[in-house]
């Protein structure tokens, strides 16, 4: 089971460096460093925080803009040094 820190790390990468909100998604193959990637994606998509795009050749993920406030609060709670950086 992935920790909240692992979830926050994935979401912070999506939000901060890649800007993947809503229709802008990134391939899961770019996140190989996360050992529990499938479990993280499953849990976050079940919450509605992560949107999964199943394409014929790859799977893309992005953050759900409907939960932007909650996602940012979660990331800042788990990774306090990012407070005020993610918008």
Indicate where each model-derived feature is located.
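Short amphipathic alpha-helical interface segments
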Residues: 2-32
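Surface-exposed polar/charged interaction patches
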Residues: 17, 47, 78-81
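Short amphipathic alpha-helical interaction segments
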Residues: 31-47
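A short, conserved structural fragment
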Residues: 45-55
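Minor-groove-contacting beta-hairpin "wing" of winged helix-turn-helix DNA-binding domains
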Residues: 57-64
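Short, amphipathic alpha-helical interaction segments positioned at domain boundaries
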Residues: 66-87
């Amino acid at each position: 089971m992935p920790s909240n820190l692992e979830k926050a790390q994935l979401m912070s990468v999506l939000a901060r460096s890649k800007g993947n909100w809503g229709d802008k998604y990134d391939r899961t193959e770019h996140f190989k460093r996360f050992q529990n990637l499938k479990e993280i994606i499953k849990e976050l998509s079940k919450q509605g925080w992560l949107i999964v795009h199943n394409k014929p050749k790859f799977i893309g993920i992005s953050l759900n803009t409907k939960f932007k406030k909650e996602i940012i609060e979660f990331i800042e709670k788990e990774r306090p040094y990012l407070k005020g950086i993610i918008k």
